[in-house]
Amino acid sequence: MSLAQPVVAIIGTRNPDHQQERKARFLSYELSHSHNCTISTGAAYGIDEAAMKGALAEKLNVYLPWSSYNREIIPDRAKIVVASERLHPHWYASVTKYHPAANRLKPGVRSLHARNYGILEHADLVIAFPNADGGGGTGQGIRIAEALNIPVMQFNKGAESVLFSCMLSNALLYLDRKKTDAIAA
């Protein structure tokens, strides 16, 4: 972890409810503007888009499955990383390792899931806004984060606002503790 800039991945559903979208945008804003965090996300419509809108563009890493993916919603000054099987073979290997039906995925979907590994691989914390069934790319992201021992905080549809406040407080405490531990080491 970088002492100056912890990395927080914000991932989630493409069909968020209004509260999920607002909370993703707020968390991204608060973490990047007030707590010097880099936000890592994937440029899908929905939660990823909300995270991009909230983040300070200079502290935003956006991971794409292919170069033309949703470019119109990515802020100009964001850092963009495009998945490439040649450059990121471990991203693609992660699909086979963590996806329950990897052998049935079409190439484009495989690239979407591969880029999930890129979003998470340098994260200190993952904040996830899954859909009701918890599957899809967000489910894949949660499986990857758990395998990499990255803490995951989930905010599901219908969660209480108290949970949101606790989640932000816990996220900040966790990041402060990691920073303190790194300084002491």
What is each residue range found by the language model?
Residues 1, 178-185:
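Short intrinsically disordered terminal tails
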Residues 2-7, 14-168:
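Acidic/glycine-enriched connector segments
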